[in-house]
């Protein structure tokens, strides 16, 4: 039987003995990851302050925790864009859902956002957390990931799916 050994604001950890082995599981919140594309065909990323990380800032896609009490996955994606970059999209395309299960468990919905129009909502994390909005050409962004100029994370898997998707169009 799975038993909870830790529950924080973001992370939950359980243990379960199966066939004499103690298996640990980490549950992370599900989320949305958005790749907004501007009128020049560039992908917008944010430079974000992260005081608990080393280094204390990072470049990443627009993203957030999926809060189903605040709407659908797509509505959450729109809200995250409004909070983090001050735009909403006329067209949202969910191009991938990544479901992780095993030791680390969560789900991420990945979106392409096009037809961006200004629409700012207050950022609940504080406006000062977003240091800048950066625009990258597809190949430039790919090179930055491959050269480790942008740190890899779960969202990097989504970028390479995006890359494959856009190259097929």
Positions of PLM-derived features:
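Acidic, metal-coordinating catalytic segment for phosphate/diphosphate chemistry
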Residues: 2-39
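Acidic pyrophosphate-coordinating catalytic loop
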Residues: 4-9, 54, 97-110
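Conserved Nudix-box catalytic region and its N-terminal flanking loop in Nudix hydrolases
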Residues: 28, 32-79, 127
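Active-site-adjacent beta-strand/loop module that shapes the phosphate/pyrophosphate-binding cleft
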Residues: 14-20, 101-120
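The catalytic Nudix box helix
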Residues: 61-96, 111, 126-129, 137
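Conserved hydrophobic "DFG−1" position in protein kinase catalytic cores
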Residues: 36, 45, 112-113, 135
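Nudix hydrolase/Nudix homology domain
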Residues: 57, 103, 126-169
